[in-house]
Amino acid sequence: MAFGAGGGGRRPFFRRRKTCPFSGPNAPKIDYKDVKLLSRYVSERGKIVPSRITAVSAKKQRELAQAIKRARFLGFLPYVIR
């Protein structure tokens, strides 16, 4: 008996692609002083969360990473969270 042959199977599940939270008319501006916004994109271990999880576009992910690194350097965000 062959799997996939025949008709009555379920439709494959497709997850809808999330849109970038920083694109759009009322999107927040990426700023290194906005610790509350930046901390949403840092894991509990202190690492920058990848864009495939946060659905941030490549350009905005680079801006976000730069802002997080700048905030860490200035002491607004910790490098490591214990």
UniProtKB/Swiss-Prot annotation:
One of its GO terms (cellular component) is cytosolic small ribosomal subunit. SUPFAM superfamilies: Ribosomal protein S18. It comes from the Bacteria. GO terms for biological process: translation. The keyword Transport does not apply. Signal peptide: none annotated. This is Small ribosomal subunit protein bS18. It comes from Methylobacterium nodulans (strain LMG 21967 / CNCM I-2342 / ORS 2060).
